[in-house]
């Protein structure tokens, strides 16, 4: 049965509440140039219709609270509801209020920064970026400012990325004005060291790496990679997408990374999906600290304050001070678990991934880069099966599918990340479902799913001819 849009439920004149007339009228207080000439085209519905509409939509959603969600490279772990209670405690704060009246909030931000520096081995940090890709761009702009300050901005115009990198890495470098060159992976799925040596030189600004990489493998030669970058004057950038595998056990700063961005909405249990809000703090080594965005939260003799006096800063990268309530949730997560708890979470994430990998291999799936997996792995179906069909079939069986067709270096890739919060029984049930799909008739797979609210979309048409508004014009 089709589900009507909220605009299709609208009936002229229906209201869910009656607004009290303002005295004086609001329009008398607002400059005329800021007033609408015509009323906004909002749906007109009563309260019950509104409640039923959004309750109905919520029952059609799939999320980590409803089913197993092994979306590779996304760390869809459970988000404790206690953190929502903590976030509500700060609901009445306003970013324009005097910092002297928001000492608790500033203290939380400062403490979170200290925790993240300790976990990553960085010397300074900004909490301002609002997402992972936003953090990436901030980090690369910091590197650009550093090279420009040294008089090398015009010569170092290249950023290196592995062929297994997240797509946001080359996009970020390009947005920052750099040329992007790809470094191939070796036969074991790690960076090809000889290829890297050929590319390094005085023309290179940075190398962007994820460790563990997107194949779920730890870059075992990371110290050698770091040494080569240092000798060439190249800044080593850490994409924190996969920090969940090593938090508390290993620190990017100790591996030689100069910049790191984190995804609080992945590693530190801030709910994500649907466009945010996210949080992508950026940590740097001391030589890059002068270029961090303003303001930074600092602690002085009279309490905590916002430091804008940073002449070499790249400036603001977001209004106000980041997605603050995301920071509250991450702070609560770290304070709840402590260092030993974080280490256990990382260890369980790795254990779950390795166990599930072996289960899928028993069901007939291949793992082309079958080294010691960390928090995730990339599998392939047997010959003749399409990753897309298997993903759609999983929806019919009640599971969210893994990431498909990424990384690009694996054909028909199924990128699986179970996270630490899933039980052994859940992993086994998922493996059984994956095995059952291989026994389904080809026609069944090609037409799945059957019982979801929306079946197969015309994805090509949706990309080429998107309809982004309900209204025709």
Curated annotation (Swiss-Prot):
Instruction: Name the chemical reaction catalysed here.
Output: N(6)-[(R)-lipoyl]-L-lysyl-[glycine-cleavage complex H protein] + glycine + H(+) = N(6)-[(R)-S(8)-aminomethyldihydrolipoyl]-L-lysyl-[glycine-cleavage complex H protein] + CO2
Gene3D superfamilies given in the database record: 6.20.440.10, Aspartate Aminotransferase, domain 1 (3.90.1150.10), Type I PLP-dependent aspartate aminotransferase-like (Major domain) (3.40.640.10)
What EC number(s) are associated with this protein in UniProt? 1.4.4.2
Where N6-(pyridoxal phosphate)lysine occurs along the chain? Answer: 266
An example of a Pfam family matching this protein is GcvP2_C
What CDD domains does this protein's entry cite? GDC-P
| Domain of life of the native organism | Bacteria
Q: Which is a Gene Ontology cellular component entry for this protein?
A: cytosol
One of the GO BP terms on file: glycine decarboxylation via glycine cleavage system
* Obligatory cofactor(s): pyridoxal 5'-phosphate
Keywords (alphabetical) are: Oxidoreductase, Pyridoxal phosphate
- Which InterPro entries does the UniProt record give? GcvPB, GDC-P_C, GDC_P, PyrdxlP-dep_Trfase, PyrdxlP-dep_Trfase_major, PyrdxlP-dep_Trfase_small
Example of a GO MF term: glycine binding
Question: How is the subunit organization of this protein annotated in UniProt?
Answer: The glycine cleavage system is composed of four proteins: P, T, L and H. In this organism, the P 'protein' is a heterodimer of two subunits.
Cross-referenced PANTHER family: GLYCINE DEHYDROGENASE (DECARBOXYLATING), MITOCHONDRIAL, GLYCINE DEHYDROGENASE, DECARBOXYLATING
NCBIfam families named among the record's database cross-references: PRK04366.1
Q: What's its job? A: The glycine cleavage system catalyzes the degradation of glycine. The P protein binds the alpha-amino group of glycine through its pyridoxal phosphate cofactor; CO(2) is released and the remaining methylamine moiety is then transferred to the lipoamide cofactor of the H protein.
* Family according to the record: Belongs to the GcvP family. C-terminal subunit subfamily.
Question: Mind telling me what this protein is named?
Answer: Probable glycine dehydrogenase (decarboxylating) subunit 2
What species does this protein belong to?
A: Thermus thermophilus (strain ATCC BAA-163 / DSM 7039 / HB27)
Question: What gene name is listed for this protein?
Answer: gcvPB
């Amino acid at each position: 049965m089709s589900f009507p849009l909220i605009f299709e439920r609208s009936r002229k004149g229906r209201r869910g509440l009656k607004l009290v007339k303002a005295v004086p009228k609001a329009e008398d207080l607002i400059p005329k140039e800021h007033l609408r000439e015509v009323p906004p085209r909002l749906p007109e519905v009563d309260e019950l219709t509104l409640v039923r509409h959004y309750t109905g939509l919520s029952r059609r959603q799939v999320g980590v609270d409803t089913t197993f969600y092994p979306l590779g490279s996304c760390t869809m772990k459970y988000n404790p509801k206690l953190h929502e209670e903590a976030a509500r405690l700060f609901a009445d704060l306003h970013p324009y209020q005097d910092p002297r009246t928001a000492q608790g909030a500033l203290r939380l931000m400062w403490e979170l920064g200290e925790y993240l520096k300790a976990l990553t081995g960085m010397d300074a940090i900004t909490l301002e970026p609002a997402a992972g890709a936003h953090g990436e761009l901030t980090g690369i702009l910091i590197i650009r400012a550093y090279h420009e300050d040294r008089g090398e901005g015009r010569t170092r115009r290249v950023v290196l990325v592995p062929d297994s990198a997240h797509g946001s890495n080359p996009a970020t470098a390009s947005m920052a004005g750099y040329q992007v060159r790809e470094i191939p992976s070796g036969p074991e799925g790690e960076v090809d060291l000889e290829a890297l040596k050929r590319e390094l030189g005085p023309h290179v600004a940075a190398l962007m790496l994820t460790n563990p990489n997107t194949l779920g493998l730890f870059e075992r030669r990371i110290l050698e990679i770091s040494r080569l970058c240092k000798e060439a004057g190249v800044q080593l950038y850490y994409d924190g997408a996969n920090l969940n595998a090593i938090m508390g056990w290993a620190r990017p700063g100790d591996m030689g990374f100069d910049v790191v961005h984190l995804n609080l909405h992945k590693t530190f249990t801030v709910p994500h999906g649907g466009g945010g809000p996210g949080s992508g703090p950026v940590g740097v080594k001391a030589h890059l600290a002068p270029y961090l965005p303003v303001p930074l939260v600092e602690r002085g003799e009279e309490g905590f304050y916002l430091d804008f006096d940073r002449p070499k800063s790249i400036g603001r990268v977001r209004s106000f001070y980041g997605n603050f309530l995301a920071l509250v949730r991450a702070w609560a997560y770290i304070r709840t678990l402590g260092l030993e708890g974080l280490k256990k979470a990382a260890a369980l994430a790795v254990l779950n991934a390795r166990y599930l990998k072996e289960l899928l291999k028993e069901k007939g799936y291949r793992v082309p880069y079958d080294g010691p997996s960390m928090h995730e792995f990339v599998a392939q179906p047997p010959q003749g099966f399409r990753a897309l069909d298997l993903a759609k079939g999983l929806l019919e069986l009640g599971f969210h599918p893994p990431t498909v067709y990424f990384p690009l270096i694996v054909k028909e890739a199924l990128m699986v990340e179970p996270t630490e919060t899933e039980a052994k029984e859940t992993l086994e049930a998922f493996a059984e479902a994956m095995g059952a799909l291989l026994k389904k008739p080809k026609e069944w797979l090609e037409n799945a799913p059957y019982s979801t609210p929306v079946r197969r979309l015309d994805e090509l048409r949706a990309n080429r001819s998107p309809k982004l508004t309900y209204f025709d014009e």
